[in-house]
A protein has these predicted regions:
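Class I S-adenosyl-L-methionine-dependent methyltransferase catalytic core
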Residues: 1-169
């Protein structure tokens, strides 16, 4: 599947640890892919109310077979809902990760937490979109977990990435 790079289990486990998910929390994985992150959430946080979104029909079928609660196929069309935790590995190409992070943050409940893999581009590019994102991020309560070079090599890409953890107060 073009542009699909599943989250390695070790990274998904770190993301779920960073998310601090408790029983009863509403949790969303909005770029669910094959369910790499959602599988870890379900395994480590069985009391969470977990929902997933995925646009690819083949991957939707896989998520359904795995028993995940598929609530939509378009990340940006799910309005009027808020989640306590959003854990995601969105596409990086053309700064799509910036769009996904901003949308996800807007759909967090007060006191919620977003944990997202992001590419390096938003943190060093000089174009307006990247600069605006950095300025926005500086106004948030956030932390960064750097990932080793080659962290996604097993998934077929050498892109450097990091985990960004943002709390909504």
């Amino acid at each position: 599947i073009p542009g699909f790079f599943p989250t390695p289990t070790s990274i998904a486990e770190e993301m779920v640890r960073q998310a601090g998910i408790s029983t009863g929390m509403r949790v969303l994985e909005p770029s669910a892919g094959s369910g790499s992150i959602a599988d870890v959430i379900r395994e480590q946080c069985p009391g969470a109310d977990l929902s997933v979104i995925e646009y690819n029909l083949t991957l939707q079928d896989l998520l359904k077979v795995k028993g995940h609660n598929l609530v939509g196929d378009d990340f940006f069309s799910v309005d009027g809902q808020q989640w306590d935790r959003i854990v995601q590995n969105p596409p990086f190409e053309n700064l799509q990760d910036v769009d996904h992070v901003r949308w996800a943050f807007d759909h967090l409940a007060d006191g919620g937490r977003l944990v997202s893999v992001m590419g390096e581009s938003p943190f060093f590019r000089s174009d307006a979109k990247a600069a605006e994102f950095r300025a926005w991020l500086d106004d948030q309560v956030y932390d960064v977990v750097d990932l080793e070079a080659g962290a996604f090599a097993a998934s077929g890409t050498g892109v450097k990435a990091r985990i960004v953890v943002i709390d909504k107060e």
